[in-house]
Amino acid sequence: MNTLVNILFILVPLLLSVAYLTYFERKVLAAIQLRHGPSVVGPFGLLQPFADAIKLLIKEPIIPFRASTILFIMAPMLTFILALIAWAVIPFGAEVIVENGQQVIIPKVIANINVGVLYVLAISSLGVYGVIIAGWSSNSNYAFLGAIRSAAQMISYEVSIGLIVAAVVITTGTLNLGEMVVAKHNMPFWVDLLLMPIGIIFFISLLAETNRHPFDLPEAEAELVSGYNVEYSSMPFALFFLGEYANMILASAMMTIFFLGGWYPPLEFSLLYKIPGLIWFVLKIVILLFIFIWIRATIPRYRYDQLMRLGWKVFLPISVLWVILISGVLLFTGNLPGSNV
């Protein structure tokens, strides 16, 4: 029963967050472009996400004549479900209890497993299958080309993401996401400075991994007419749409855990610790989501060759070099977990 309550406690706010992220994006883009944005449905346009959802619900789903029906329907469901189940291991706070006279920090998470990092990486890697299935089953040249682009792009940047996460794991000595946040919080400040350059690379790689601007080549409107989801309408299209925004929130949560201190306040002031950790966690995610949208409004789209060159010839060598550098520095200074055993 407690597990079900925890799942609902995560799932319901997450679905509402995904819905209102679309509203937030339209409002931010409108402000940057000196427009009003959604302002008709409800006060300040706050009911616009529900109006969009109702519109998509009552529209008729159209399946192309030559499409593989089962795979065509399964692809958006797979994409959306994978974006949600990754949250099972994301810690959004912690509580401190006393056992045998010692303080023990217990993360607030649905499944506090010791291989949480591997779980998140595995689930995020599976997302490419939904895109590939959608492109192939649509029997459309535009959709298939968009799916191939997406697969190549996601696989290319997953290599850098994996190496950067490996550097964080080496630094903290754990694959448990909650323990990782606590370990990073207790480390010297210079370790955070050492991780900062690859933190920037990690965030840029997340833009490519989530197919967001300026790396949204799989759904380049001018070339591929929306890309891999061009044949979708009604709720199947909405599931792809929600999956993309759910992945944005998940990517921001991963960035927060790996590099921004998770639920801890940014500065060591006792006054800041009176604010609940959940508030800090959500605030950091919102700031990162704003940066996602800000980048979309200001930076032009990369060419495909530039995208591949950046991933393989720039990010990959830097990531490999930084893993070696961090390991050497931590070993030399005696801060490498397990080096003094």
Swiss-Prot record:
Its placement in the membrane is given as: Multi-pass membrane protein
Identify one Pfam family in the record.
NADHdh
Gene Ontology CC terms: plasma membrane
Q: Which residues cross the membrane?
A: 4-24, 38-58, 70-90, 115-135, 161-181, 187-207, 239-259, 275-295, 314-334
| One term of GO molecular function | oxidoreductase activity, acting on NAD(P)H, quinone or similar compound as acceptor
| Primary location recorded for the protein, binned into one broad class | membrane
**Keywords tagged on the record:** Cell membrane, Membrane, NAD, Quinone, Translocase, Transmembrane, Transmembrane helix, Ubiquinone
Compartments annotated for it: namely: Cell membrane
Does RNA-binding show up as a keyword for this record?
A: no
The reply on keyword RNA-binding is no
Catalysed reaction, written as an equation: a quinone + NADH + 5 H(+)(in) = a quinol + NAD(+) + 4 H(+)(out)
Biological process according to GO? aerobic respiration
EC number in record: 7.1.1.-
On assembly, the entry states: NDH-1 is composed of 14 different subunits. Subunits NuoA, H, J, K, L, M, N constitute the membrane sector of the complex.
Q: What does this protein do?
A: NDH-1 shuttles electrons from NADH, via FMN and iron-sulfur (Fe-S) centers, to quinones in the respiratory chain. The immediate electron acceptor for the enzyme in this species is believed to be ubiquinone. Couples the redox reaction to proton translocation (for every two electrons transferred, four hydrogen ions are translocated across the cytoplasmic membrane), and thus conserves the redox energy in a proton gradient. This subunit may bind ubiquinone.
Q: Which family does it belong to?
A: Belongs to the complex I subunit 1 family.
Its name, as the record gives it, is NADH-quinone oxidoreductase subunit H
Question: Gene behind this chain?
Answer: nuoH
